């Protein structure tokens, strides 16, 4: 099999070292039995991300074909659910896919965020699990479910309110930091967008791609009980994480 590993990045300098270390280890594992290509797309960073990615991509390129696009589009760095934000992210994901080799070469396309912590061997389980779209689940530094907007159990939901999964769960949509997609829908024209084709409303880009897959007959979407963690970002999360580390030492 051949895998395309994709990462989009913007102002993630603080997370690049762990991103590289994990991705490098995962690539080594995959290369034992498969072909791998890596695609990285960055735009409009102002914190040193551009140079950091250049350094790490040069190292990854010694393992397999690796493409980096670093550009300045002049887009604002938005937060929340704004239509411009999800459109920017969707465009970045599409560019990341399209700058790689011909899509016809790949069996699976895997998106891996820069700001997640995971065990490479567990990521392998996600990547190899049979399904049209497969993910684990994300938690924040306090152990709470993280990717609640993108993850939905039914078409009527707009937010995940089902707690932490303890078993494989069929879902309407998912992403959760590491998400493996069958390449066939992309070969047939599926792309990310900020507009949900079923509701014609602004929606999470990674929810939208699940809707697009479903619309063309790829509806096997699952979330596995594999924890992908986000490091602490707020003061409250940092204090909680520090307290937990102290308790583990006792």
Tell me the role of every PLM-derived stretch:
Residues 2-7, 23, 36-40:
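Hydrophobic targeting segments
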Residues 12-28:
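Short, well-formed alpha-helical segments that are part of the catalytic scaffolds
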Residues 15, 47-56:
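Acidic helix N-cap motif at the loop->helix transition within catalytic regions
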Residues 34-44, 69-71:
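Short beta-strand/loop segment that forms part of the nucleotide-sugar
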Residues 52, 56-104:
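Active-site-proximal specificity loops/subdomain of glycosyltransferases
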Residues 98, 104-117:
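Short beta-strand-to-loop acidic/aromatic patch adjacent to the donor-nucleotide binding site
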Residues 116-194:
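Conserved catalytic core of nucleotide-sugar-dependent glycosyltransferases
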Residues 166-250:
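C-terminal catalytic/acceptor-binding lobe
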């Amino acid at each position: 099999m051949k895998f395309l590993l994709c990462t989009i990045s913007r102002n993630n300098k603080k997370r690049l070292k762990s991103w590289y270390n994990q991705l490098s280890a995962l690539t080594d594992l995959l290369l034992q039995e498969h072909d791998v290509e890596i695609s990285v797309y960055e735009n409009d960073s102002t914190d040193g991300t551009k140079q950091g990615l250049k350094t790490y991509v040069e190292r990854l390129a010694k393992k397999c074909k690796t493409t980096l696009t670093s550009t300045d589009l002049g887009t604002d760095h938005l937060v929340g659910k704004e239509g411009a934000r999800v459109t920017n992210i969707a465009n970045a994901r599409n560019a990341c896919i399209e700058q790689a080799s011909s899509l016809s070469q790949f069996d699976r396309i895997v998106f891996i965020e820069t700001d997640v912590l995971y065990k490479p061997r567990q990521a392998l389980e996600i990547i190899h699990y049979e399904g049209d779209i497969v993910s684990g689940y994300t938690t924040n530094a306090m152990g709470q479910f993280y990717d609640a907007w993108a993850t939905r159990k039914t078409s009527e939901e707009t937010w995940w309110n089902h707690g932490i999964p303890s078993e494989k769960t069929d879902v309407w949509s998912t992403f959760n930091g590491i998400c493996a997609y069958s390449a066939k829908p992309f070969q047939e024209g599926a792309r990310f967008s900020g507009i949900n084709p079923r509701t014609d409303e602004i929606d999470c880009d990674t929810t939208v791609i699940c809707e697009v897959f479903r619309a063309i007959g790829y509806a096997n979407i699952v979330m596995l009980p594999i924890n992908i963690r986000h490091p602490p970002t707020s003061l409250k999360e940092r204090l909680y994480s520090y307290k937990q580390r102290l308790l583990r030492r006792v």
